[in-house]
């Protein structure tokens, strides 16, 4: 619990600026919830998912990338909306 709190404090300090910086999840598994501060001008977070030989895979991050057919993409515009 202390580690989670410390992580949130560090992310908050890093993301503090005089404008608004979007915060998006960038973790690969539900057990590893990490975030990133998006660059200036980035206004969306994404979550894309697909199936491969290892099962269901999900990738998250800043922006809204183009994806190939067969990949499900969800883009959103609020902090941590891609969880």
UniProtKB/Swiss-Prot annotation:
This is Three finger toxin MALT0054C. Disulfide bonds join 24-45, 38-62, 64-75, 76-81. Its main location: secreted. Belongs to the three-finger toxin family. Short-chain subfamily. Type I alpha-neurotoxin sub-subfamily. SUPFAM superfamilies: Snake toxin-like. Expressed by the venom gland. CDD domains: TFP_snake_toxin (cd00206). Binds to muscle nicotinic acetylcholine receptor (nAChR) and inhibit acetylcholine from binding to the receptor, thereby impairing neuromuscular transmission. One of its GO terms (cellular component) is extracellular region.
């Amino acid at each position: 619990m202390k580690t989670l709190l410390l992580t949130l404090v560090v992310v908050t300090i890093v993301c503090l600026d005089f404008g608004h910086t979007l915060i998006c999840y960038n973790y690969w598994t539900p057990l590893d919830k990490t975030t990133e501060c998006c660059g200036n001008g980035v206004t969306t977070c994404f979550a894309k998912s697909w199936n491969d030989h290892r099962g269901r895979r999900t990738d998250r991050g800043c922006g809204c990338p183009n994806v190939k057919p067969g990949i499900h993409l969800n883009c959103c515009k609020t902090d941590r909306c891609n969880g």
